[in-house]
Amino acid sequence: MCIRDRWSRCRNDYDAIIYVASWPAGRRDVWRTLLRARAIENQAYVLGVNRTGDDPRLHYSGDSAVIGCKGETLAEAGEGQRLLTARLDMDELRRFREKFPAWRDADDFDLK
């Protein structure tokens, strides 16, 4: 399995993307929605790791999750700190990418 940063999303040479974030509890629905969207648009597994706890003005709920390549939730922490485990099925990912080869319609470019 290869893990790349989000700027190489059109290359199809990665299988999972890790997002580390500090989304406050008041925006937890946005966090969950964006994780699913990133998995679908990149045709990759997404591992979302979000902050927990409080600071003087905000509460951070966690809501870390593992999302499948079709946007389905494979594991979810809910509120607070949790250890998540999930099986990332590379055969399923390959079949999905072959059935929907959207990555082939990408423009490869460099930002300078």
Where do the protein language model's features map onto the residues?
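Active-site beta-loop-alpha substructure in enzyme catalytic cores
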Residues: 3-42, 46-48
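C-terminal beta-strand edge segments of enzyme domains
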Residues: 51-112
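Generic detector of short, aliphatic-rich beta-strand segments that form the cores of beta-sheets
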Residues: 1-2, 86
